[in-house]
Amino acid sequence: IETGKGDFAEEVLTLNRLAQRMRKTRFKRGAVSFQREEAKFKLDAEGKPLGVYFKEQKEANQLIEEFMLLANKQVAEFCGHHKVNGRAVRRTMVYRVHDVPNEEKLEKFRSFVLRFGYVFKADKGRAVAKEMNKLLGQAKGRIEENVISNLAVRAMSKAFYSTDNIGHYGLAFPYYTHFTSPIRRYPDMMVHRLLARYLEGGKSADRDTFEKLCVHASEREVIAAEAERASIKYKMVEFMQDKIGQFFDGHISGMSDWGMYVELDETHIEGMAVSYTHLRAHE
């Protein structure tokens, strides 16, 4: 895309223009623009980390993302917004839903970013998404960007699977599901089966059965995410193991009663500087 050359260049560039237009429209409608950095490790032959780098987000990634979102949205709408003789008929569907932000979490987020000099005004509705995008734009490229971006994600509600459609707040979609990755996510496989059933004119599937599967999938997703975070932290500790005594530039990313969290500027590895008072109290 960057060079504008190669096989099928015209077709790819046309798709990219459409993707960028869809992306712009999505944010205008109130989608939240989270740009989280994905940590990767350079490993030696034995799997020991030699360095930390971050996956770069390019227009090609955005192209794939926008058409993936479009496919997920259209499948959810087709299955969930069905009409017979002009009348809406509810059919069982596995949705990926995202509720409005929790006001208590937003208040904590507001207090934290204020320490960096940012003013976050909104507390509910679509105004939160607009204000969040504004703040993330202001923090972009600054030393605290990663910390604020991560905390912004935590301030939002957690997306989950359900047969009860409440829409997807973060994407600003009234209908949304996970359809595009059936080889790695079981909810996508459920959606494929439901779509095939409805395309063939089948009746609505049993809602209770699929709701139980949605609850199970959501629970397992949380466990998988925790395991992923733990594995990344393990590799970061392994990377820093032979660097004890060295000096690094960093910034305070959080505070607690027993010390402060510090994030290194270059690698974004976070650790705790335990307070002397806390150490003395636990001798």
Regions found by a protein language model. Give the residues of each.
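A short, hydrophobic C-terminal helix/tail in secreted or cell-surface proteins
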Residues: A281-E283
